[in-house]
Amino acid sequence: MNGIITPQKQKQLMSSPSRDPLSTTELSTPTSQTTVDVNDTKKSEGLDSTIILLTPGTSPNATPGSSELGLSKKPNSIKNNTYSTAAQAAYLNRRAADQSTVMTTDPISYANNNINNGTLPQQNAYYANSYYPSYYAQSQAISNNRPGVSGFRPAFNSVAPCYGSQWQTHQSVHPYHVNNTHQYLKPYVQNVYPQMPSLNQPGLHIVNQPTYLAPVPSATVPTNSVSLSMPSFSQGQKNIPAAINQEMSVGTTKENTNYLSQLVGLHPAIPPAIPSMFPMSHDNKKSNMESTSRTRNVYIRGLPPNTSDENLLLYTNRFGKVSSSKAIIDMETNLCKGYGFACFEEEKSALICISAMTLCGYQCSFAKESFSARLQSLQDTESTNLYISNLPLHWNESDISTLFKPSKIISNRVLRDSKEQSRGVGFARMQDRKTAEDIINKFNNFVLDPALPPLQIRFADSTDQKKFKGQTQKRRLWRAREYSVLTKGMTANNAFSKVEEFANNSMPSKVGMYVPLESNTVYQHSPTYDTYGWQSMYPSYSVYPSNYENSRSTTPYHAHPATSAAN
């Protein structure tokens, strides 16, 4: 019975207040009307005093085509329909002028709250041209939006829209941080240099050379630094294995090899050596461990071209206190010639350096007698023949005799070229050794003409000295040519320009860059090795593993001491 509409109920419904289904405005009666007078100022714009009748229930949310769109007019307004249309146009113009060109609110919320369902036409929600949604946002069309343009609705309600340059500051487009704090992206290795640590930073093992302290990365970045208790050099290196600490001989046990491998793997890891075409044999390696003159100076051959004095100090000061070190640099190319020297304060530190560097493929030995000292030891102590250089080009034999008077000269000669032009060089044989020594003391560095260099007088080379000079010169030329061939691919593309200075750039050199540390190794290829194709020079087993039993047998110059002894 409740659903049956009786004439009485219908009468009550007609007399009760009615409600627009899409509006909150109540209508007192279906026929109630409100008059709105147009301002008299509009008359100057060509408008009459037309009265526009609007239904109070009309709302911007009324659907198109509803009965609320009808405008009730007074009888005299029917003939003034054109003026009513003009009034609507004026209203729209005022509304468009008040509309802000650039929205200050969220365009998504504006579009959701201002859908075009109103009675009067409205502008569509304005989307700034520089608005970019997040890359993970899902494109969803907003109903009755701008024709042909679909809106964007982020998948997460908490995401705020971005404008212009603000898009790049949004967290979703940030690059991945090495600490793995981003929740959407997968990690990747970032090609950066670690920060230079402070001098007193805890956890640093190499502290005996604070001036050239190597940078270490943060604990969150895996590197090739090895967690190893470095021996305290100030305490006499108590952690050195007995075979090295007591016998001072080549490490031939597994304990010694592992210990040396750990020293090699400390940051900065010592790079693989430039190989030699004619490496030393195992017998020569043993002889290189013997210091006949009890010297502490170590000769190291096989250094990469980018090795500087600072790099060499960083490589050698892990074995003990270094009193001096020098990498031999070519003055023309500013690159290392492939060898250098390191002088230690203690002989046992030099022994450890030779053993460890040999493990990396370097040719190391106690520095032999210098070239000048060796040459002097080969001279003839009974010779009276003098070698004279920087002679004036117009001088002849009589001029030399006149210069050395009253000393007696047995014979003299000025060297000339094929055109009989003087070379500025001559010889003079004196009467005895004492007279020759007096001539050297008196006329060596003697200035004949301020426009010419001073005279240089010394004893002429003996037969043994000439032979030694020839051998040394050939050896140096061969090694220089060999080293140039082996490093040609590295220097051709300027791969080894001048190494960055640690103090100026606060970053490690190319050799000291970081590479990920694998689980079962204590020594990794340096980035220099991987970048410049040194794999063609070394076999795959030239990386020295900590599990020594599983290492493969090697050729002599790659051999571990223990492997060579076993064979």
Curated annotation (Swiss-Prot):
Chief site of localization: cytoplasm
Gene Ontology cellular component terms for the protein in this record: cytoplasm; cytosol; nucleus; ribonucleoprotein complex
Transmembrane segments: none
A Gene Ontology BP annotation from the UniProt entry: meiosis II
Gene3D superfamilies: 3.30.70.330
Regions of compositional bias (Polar residues) in chain numbering: 1-18, 56-66
Region feature (Disordered): 1-39, 52-76
Keyword DNA-binding part of the UniProt annotation: no
Function comment: RNA-binding protein which plays a role in sporulation. Regulates the progression of meiosis I and may function in the vicinity of the Mei2 dot.
Low complexity: compositionally biased ranges: 21-35
Highest taxon of the lineage: Eukaryota
Ranges for domain RRM: 296-380, 384-462
The protein's name in its UniProt record: Sporulation-specific protein 5
Keywords: Cytoplasm, Meiosis, Repeat, RNA-binding, Sporulation
